[in-house]
Amino acid sequence: MTKRAIVAVGGFTSDSGKTTLVCELLRGLPGWEAVKMTRGHYRSCGRDPHACCVSPLLGEEPVIRSGREETYEAGKDTGKYWEAGAANVHWAVVTDRQVGQGIELALARVRSPGVLVEGNSFLRHVAADFTLMVARADRLKLKPSARRVLDRVSAFYLSGEGDAALLRETFEAWRGSENLSGPAADAPVYTREDLPRLLARFRRIV
């Protein structure tokens, strides 16, 4: 697989603002591609709109869809990636056991120097060049898939509007109460006003 700059965008919860951030980053990173990872379960329908009713796609092998014809649908996360200017979009539909194979297959299709990957679980299988963990300051709860990859975090990103200093203060109070260890204990915290700095940093890693 050709080496690409991989920026992972994970999230504390399903509605933390991951997709919004991916789209904001795509607008500032012309030529980058995007990957959406969807973990499905047979006969189940999750809160993620993409995960809902994907069970017909699940099989012995991961399903990878690429290109506008296969991945664009208005209102869906992959459609939003296209609207934000992604050079290409890849959608990997996998079971829990197929996450590693699915992300490898999706990344093998990337032709751009950089790619944004939305999701948490794939980080147990692929080393990203930079991992942003998105959280809402008013909802600082960690779902299991996020907690399992905190040791991969490069930085936290606080989504939503509001005073940046207050958002950081709220987050730091939570971080102190959680007694986090490893990279998550002192990883830098970004807010929307820091997007230009993040974009500049990502441009340098390609």
Feature-to-residue mapping (PLM):
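Glycine-rich phosphate-binding P-loop
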Residues: 7-25
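Conserved beta-strand elements of the Class I
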Residues: 8, 33-35, 133
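N-terminal phosphate/diphosphate-binding loop that engages ATP/GTP or pyrophosphate donors
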Residues: 20-94
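Short, high-confidence coil segments that cap the C-terminus of an alpha-helix
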Residues: 30-32, 86, 110-115, 128
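Phosphate-binding/switch loop-helix module in NTP-utilizing enzymes
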Residues: 88-123
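Conserved catalytic-core segment of NTP-binding enzymes
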Residues: 114, 119-201, 205
